[in-house]
């Protein structure tokens, strides 16, 4: 991707305690994106929020389990994002946890490549 290129940003809103095959759901999504050749993905940790259950989740020192909102953000060319959504639709429909998925258009302003290890 080059500066000025049009792209799409996919956001998946989930909870930090959501699991898939006994592993954190956010990890599953990140590895799915990587396996499918997506340019990049990041997990953003919220400090407070609520979803369809209307239960407010926040980070409190005295709680044993930290249940906070997470956003998995994935950015790539439109066709790659569309394919990622289509090929993982069944997975997202089957996770059995509250979540919302959004997609919007974005423009690449800068894309600095890191060195592969």
Indicate residue ranges for each PLM-predicted region.
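Positively charged, small/polar-rich N-terminal and surface patches that mediate targeting and assembly
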Residues: 1-117
């Amino acid at each position: 991707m080059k500066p000025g290129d049009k792209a799409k940003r996919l956001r998946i809103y989930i909870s930090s305690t959501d699991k898939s095959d006994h592993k954190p759901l956010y990890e599953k999504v990140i590895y799915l994106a990587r396996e499918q050749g997506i340019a990049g993905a990041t997990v953003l940790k919220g400090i407070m929020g609520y979803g369809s259950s209307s239960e407010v989740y926040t980070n409190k020192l005295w709680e044993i389990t930290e249940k906070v909102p997470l956003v998995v953000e994935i950015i790539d060319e439109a066709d790659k994002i569309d394919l990622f959504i289509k090929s993982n639709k069944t997975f997202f429909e089957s996770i059995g946890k509250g979540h919302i998925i959004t997609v919007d258009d974005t423009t690449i302003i800068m894309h600095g490549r890191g060195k592969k290890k």
